[in-house]
Amino acid sequence: MSAIFEILDKDAGGRIGKLRTPHGVVETPTVMPVINPNIQLISPKEMRSFGAEILITNSYIIYRKEELRTVALEKGLHELLGFDGPIMTDSGSFQLSVYGSVEVTNEEILGFQEKIGSDIIVPLDIPTPPDVHFRRAEEELATTAERLEAARKFIQSKQLLAGPVQGSTYPELREKAASHLKDLNFEVYPLGAVVPLMESYRYAELVDVIAASKKGLSPTSPVHLFGAGHPMMFALAVALGCDLFDSAAYALYAKDGRYITSNGTYHLEKLNYLPCSCPVCSRYTAEELRKAKNKEELLGRHNLYATFAEIRLIKQSIKDGKLLELVEQRCRAHPKLLDGLKRLYTHSAWLEQFDPATKGTYFYCGPESASRPEVLRFGKRLERFSIEGSAIIRTSPVKGEKDYDRILTFKAPFGTFPAEMEEVYPFNAEVPKFPDYEALSTSLSNTIKLMDLNPGAEFTFICEKEFQHPLIEEIGKKAKLVYREAWKKE
């Protein structure tokens, strides 16, 4: 594990950790509010009251403005912003992505960040946007790699150095870049050029980008999802292993009259009620907030409260082993997020290696739950069950079951397991009485696999009338199939 990053708790790919910086320890996952040195809707010194432990600002903006540059060089970045905690600085890559060029070299901006006392320094990488030609992505990635290698040699202080992972929307390039950077031993790994994906709600592709990058990195490396600032997607990103986010959304949305919640965004002009109990929403009605002279500031404050409330809920969900339940709730807030959830579970085999072997009770939240890592793990371990003689499979106790050599329980979405394990994780799962098609598909497939692994056993399967699924016919070829109603009459 990295000397500067300690993992305390885990669930799925998410983790609670401690990131050590020159200006203190930060608990992750967390959000870094973006501070514009020229325009401060809410002062940096107030950020701690919302829950902020670390800020991020743009060193290129400071570098370009003589007044700011002079103060930063003479008194330091922390004095300039009036914040005594950790501060990360971006290098100007955002301006490069927007305007196509910046008036500074990689070495110049690295040296400037080092001199002003940034806690996390970011090199001037090339933010390759989505959907470009593969050759362009590959060429720009090579340029970024050269700059990052130079940065690693250039920065020798105790300040942390970030190694941004680029590669556009090509998972193979993302994983290749991450693997290369891992060998250079950066302290923090931002995932760059993902804002266009989030702005266009391309969450399925975002999931692939994050997963590919994470697969190339050490599992103990802290990961920063650059430009991710809306709380509705934090849980999804955390479940993939992201530890740091940065948010200018609190201010940008406030300027546009938008009200952030963990389930999406409202336009203040259309709100009759404020669905929040933060200090702002507890004091004002929707109408009063609209008429307030400092409406933008108040809205920005609410947006920050909502942002950090979601971070706290995510941390508690990790503690409780309920992160994926939260992810499934959040991803039903928007169809595109649901696409992201479905894509997340295509990576379940990878996630399963990080998911704790035992944790809080599994809750079935919908069809996607049938693809969770816990279910996949069960399917991989069916060979551990050795069954001989007569065996009865049922969802709940039936008359005459003790006449059989083995009593087995069927529970979707898992499948069939020894009845004596019903109260053991994950079989103590809370599931619907009537399983959906996806849950039946997985559980019946696992049951067929169990039967195939134990060809010497004689199975009797007590089927519920609600089990309408093509695989029931296959079960009937391998076991005596009896519907519960018919069993009662025997």
Curated annotation (Swiss-Prot):
Pfam families cross-referenced by the UniProt entry: TGT (PF01702)
Residues that hold substrate according to the record: D125, A193
Natural source organism: Methanosarcina mazei (strain ATCC BAA-159 / DSM 3647 / Goe1 / Go1 / JCM 11833 / OCM 88) (Methanosarcina frisia)
E.C. code: 2.4.2.48
SUPFAM superfamilies xref list: Pre-PUA domain, tRNA-guanine transglycosylase
Cofactor: how and how many bound: Binds 1 zinc ion per subunit.
Cited function: Exchanges the guanine residue with 7-cyano-7-deazaguanine (preQ0) at position 15 in the dihydrouridine loop (D-loop) of archaeal tRNAs.
PANTHER family reported in the protein's UniProt record: QUEUINE TRNA-RIBOSYLTRANSFERASE
UniProt record similarity statement: Belongs to the archaeosine tRNA-ribosyltransferase family.
GO biological process: tRNA wobble guanine modification
UniProt: Zn(2+) binding residues: C276, C278, C281
Gene3D superfamilies listed in its UniProt record: Queuine tRNA-ribosyltransferase-like (3.20.20.105)
Protein name stated in the entry: tRNA-guanine(15) transglycosylase
Active site residues per record: D90
Molecular function GO terms recorded: pentosyltransferase activity; zinc ion binding
GO cellular component terms given for this protein: cytoplasm
Cofactor dependence: Zn(2+)
Organism ancestry: Archaea, Methanobacteriati, Methanobacteriota, Stenosarchaea group, Methanomicrobia
Keywords (A to Z) from UniProt: Glycosyltransferase, Metal-binding, Transferase, tRNA processing, Zinc
